[in-house]
């Protein structure tokens, strides 16, 4: 995993006065990029859920959802990951025809606002979870054509999630070790909590 520097600055700069005014786009370090990160993802999910309100043609519905998913995939892979969290993954083919994958992270991660990073990872995780839910729902209701559409959405979202997880850790062994430690610490934390005392109900005549 090699480091890279990015001199592009898009969006407003967060100030203390802006953070004290409650929720607004200006509370983010790069509000325009945050909006781009969530807009196509949300639009694809919204149209999938309400597609029949816009058109009865499954072909049109499929093409619209596929277009939104493609725009979301490209935006997250090439823009929002680089500008919100300083991560980038890509691939190239060498002269011998071999495919090489690159997973990179910025050298100075303090340049990226904490709230921007949280929104980025939240959207990256919620997206695949929502599409997997739609896959299960379509399967249980025997709507197999919609299950295929939802499966396509899940795969495209999971591809970005996997790519950025690889950027976050040098290799799969480090990533697996991190989640194992996280699970162990959660189990240990729960085990250290004092047991709750159970009180029998008191009945009065």
Swiss-Prot record:
Cellular component, GO annotation: Golgi membrane
Listed name of the protein: Uncharacterized Golgi apparatus membrane protein-like protein C34D4.4
Sorted UniProt keywords: Membrane, Transmembrane, Transmembrane helix
BP term (GO), one: protein secretion
Membrane-spanning intervals of the chain: 45-65, 119-139, 144-164
Main location: membrane
One protein family per Pfam: DUF846
Lipid bilayer topology: Multi-pass membrane protein
Coiled-coil blocks: none
Family, as annotated: Belongs to the TVP23 family.
Record has Protein transport as a keyword: no
UniProt entry tagged with the keyword Iron: no
Organism from which the protein derives: Caenorhabditis elegans
Subcellular location: Membrane
